[in-house]
Design a protein with these regions (language model features):
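Mid-membrane cores of alpha-helical transmembrane segments in multi-pass membrane proteins
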Residues: 33-36, 80, 84
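Transmembrane alpha-helix entry/boundary detector in multi-pass membrane proteins
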Residues: 2, 22-41, 68-75
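Start-of-domain marker
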Residues: 1-18
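Juxtamembrane "helix-exit" motif on the non-cytosolic side of transmembrane helices
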Residues: 16-22, 93-97
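Canonical alpha-helical transmembrane segments
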Residues: 13-18, 38-53
Length: 153
C-alpha cells in the first residue's frame, strides 16, 4: 500500500500544481488526477491500516482462505481497471470528436490512472501468488520418531 499511497500523493501534489498552471485539456487532466488520487490515498490508508492488523493466530486453512479471497479481489480489480482504461479512452475520443477540452483531459487522466492500477493489481497478484506457492508447498507429514509421532506442516 506504500506504492499506492506514494503514487496518490505524488499525483495529488502534481495535479494540484498542474491544475493552476495549465490551460485547455491539461487543466482537466490534472483536475481528474487530483480527484482520482484522493480516493486512491484513502484506499491506501485503509489498506495500510488493515495490513498492520494481521491476525497471527490464523490457522493454515483460514490463512489459505484469506489468500484466495485476496487473489479473487485482485483479479476483479484488474477487470475494473480494464473498464477504467476503456472508459477513459472513450471519453478521450469523445472529447476529440466534440472538441471538449474537459472530456479530453478527463479521458487521458482515466487512461493513465487505470493503466497504473492495472499494473499495480497484476504485480500484486503475481507477488501474492509466488508467496502462496511457498505456502502451498508445505505439506502435512506424520512421522514416527521412536517415542511417538511427529506431525509437521
Amino acid at each position: 500500500m506504500i506504492v499506492l499511497g506514494s503514487w496518490a500523493t505524488s499525483n495529488i501534489i502534481s495535479g494540484t500544481i498542474g491544475y493552476y498552471r495549465s490551460d485547455n485539456s491539461s487543466k482537466y487532466f490534472h483536475q481528474m488526477n487530483t480527484a482520482w488520487n484522493l480516493v486512491n490515498l484513502g484506499i491506501a490508508g485503509f489498506g495500510y491500516n488493515g495490513a498492520s492488523e494481521i491476525d497471527l493466530s490464523l490457522g493454515y486453512e483460514a490463512a489459505l482462505d484469506k489468500m484466495q479471497s485476496f487473489d479473487k479481489l485482485l483479479l476483479i480489480n484488474s477487470g475494473l481497471d480494464l473498464l477504467y482504461i476503456g472508459s477513459g479512452a472513450w471519453l478521450w475520443d469523445q472529447g476529440i470528436d466534440t472538441s471538449s477540452e474537459r472530456l479530453t483531459g478527463y479521458g487521458k487522466s482515466i487512461v493513465l490512472q487505470g493503466s497504473f492500477l492495472l499494473l499495480f493489481d497484476i504485480s500484486l497478484y503475481l507477488i501474492h501468488r509466488r508467496h502462496a506457492k511457498n505456502l502451498g508447498e508445505r505439506s502435512t507429514q506424520l512421522t514416527f520418531t521412536g517415542n511417538g509421532f511427529l506431525l509437521s506442516f
